[in-house]
């Protein structure tokens, strides 16, 4: 037979459960659970700022550390595209475009983990502008859906529609280009 819980005991049980839930949430928040900021991104592991050197179209060196711009994939330095039946060094052009975007202006980067090559994965800004988004919107990088939430898909669509950067040429997806080169070697 079922026992009936007295009304006062039921209130204490409910209140105790509520207190436990609130304390658990606070413990996760303050003791290092996957803390989320307002956009839903993980908080960065660390921030780094200063003048950067361009390595290629999606990689920078800042304070001696290589940083990969998170969420984009630009043509590799040795990669060529085709325009009007002629090869175009689109990897070098992408790197030059990135260099033009940052110039000597300081960058503020939020580093969020590392890639398989040990480079810090970073979201970098200069003068309030998201560098990866600008590279994608200008057509010199693709939104990298494999490792991002599609954050730059709209910028890529705008570049494609406007035939900007590599979208004005015939090109191979940088990830496919790298895979083909690995298979050939």
Report each predicted region and the residues it spans.
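Small beta-barrel nucleic-acid-binding modules, primarily SNase/OB-fold domains
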Residues: 1-185
